Amino acid sequence: NLDTLELCRTLNITREEFDARMLKLKDRNRNPGYSRYTQQLFMSQLSDKSFSVFQEKMYRFPGFYVQRRSIRQYKHSIAAHVLGDVAEVSPSDIENDDYYIPGDYIGKQGVERSYEKQLRGEKGIQILLRDVHGRIKGSYMNGEHDRLPVPGKNLTLSIDYKLQALGERLLEGKIGSIVAIEPSTGEILCMVSSPTYDPRLMVGRLRSENHKVLSRDSWKPLLNRSIMGQYPPGSTFKTTQGLTFLSEGIVTPSTPFPCSGGFNFRGLHVGCHGHPSPLPLVPSLSTSCNGYFCWGLYYMIGNKKKYGTVQDAMNKWRDYMVSMGFGYRLGVDLPGEKRGFIPNASVYDKAYRGSWNGLTIISISIGQGEVTATPLQIANLGATIANRGYYYVPHVVKEIQNDNLDTLYTNRHYTMAHEEHYEYVVQGMRAAATGGTCRALAQYDFEACGKTGTAQNRGRDHSVFMGFAPMNNPKIAVAVYVENGGWGADYGVPLGGLIMEQYLKGELSETSKARADEFQKRRINYGTDRR
């Protein structure tokens, strides 16, 4: 007794779509909970217009009715990769967790996914008695076993709205990431991945279509490059090398190494820019000398008296890198985190059939070669140096209503490098900010520490920065990674400085506002290559 065509016109769907929906609804493979005697979801999220028309004509469609429900809304247009989104459960979701039934919503990305169980709450239960025709005859045992629904828990994020908005502005027209962390807690203050999208596109009936459009975009706006991008860290990695060489006794703070246009030994040349030579650690960091760190690695890997074999030396080196947060997932409370890559001896034994030495792998000492890291790992390195030897696993959730954070995020994680050696690295990063490769930071009235990186790439080099401020009692650690941005001083340092100023001062100076506007307008031509 159903006028199917009238129903289709009312809901603004075709007859073919009606048939497809009914087939899906009755298919027990796609809808395991189907029963002709229980209510089934035919269509969700009607538009205001369709709802109004349907309400007027509902009496013509026996068996169909409307049920109100809450849907997710996002107030602002920023932080899409952090917030994530929700969507209707898939058959696999239902199969994996019997909490869900068709028509339920589940977190798909970001915080929505990581904290799904805290956000979803608990469903209410009402047990009803029905006759053989499915008609309700009353409550079972007068509702004795019924249960009221329990709302999900409120989450408080650590994201600073103004900082996040500024970071997204600065990266417009560029591919890359900005991550800022509070060193004393591990709380993530901003996590910017560019290109991005408006999280409000992932709400409502158009979510599926909008998701398809974003998925097809060759610049991959759905990719959270802050935790999924795996890049060479470039010269920001030199800080880890200095700490390792000092802690292992390969060098002292005053040990100098020569650099005449680079590292030159046994026919191998690793170039470097002009600066005084020879240099010890602190000025080698401030000038970003390649030669110093190449020599340091060469002497560590070749020290058979201390390590016995190059393999044992290499694995000791790797242990230091892992202790500093590289080569494994840090454990951030967001889905999809990549681990980056830190090679061990077996990698080179396989590649070179056991015939290799420090010269073979010299490029890893300057953050090139096989070494890769995520922007989050680079920012975490900044936080570790700021803390002089320990870090908290970075996280975006600051507080869970009536609950405690996982101890993963509240326990300190110490590195293998000795605490006293961090002061030399801090001195080098401060010197870089006052007169070295990060000297653009000298304009600020807070004591910033920084390290540039210019990561070699098949095309134009990537621009990288890692730093923190102030030098003592630091409040913020920052990593900036701009694909094909050129020198670290071209994009990394100025963008990192603006992020520091915004957070420490609460607003940008008039001069900095003009500089931020300038960088917002800058575009990098990436051509038509898919990334």
PLM region spans:
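Beta-lactam-recognizing serine transpeptidase/beta-lactamase-like catalytic domain environment
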Residues: 131-136, 140-146, 184-236, 240-488, ...
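Periplasmic/cell-envelope proteins involved in peptidoglycan metabolism and beta-lactam response
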Residues: 1-208, 230, 313-323, 365, ...
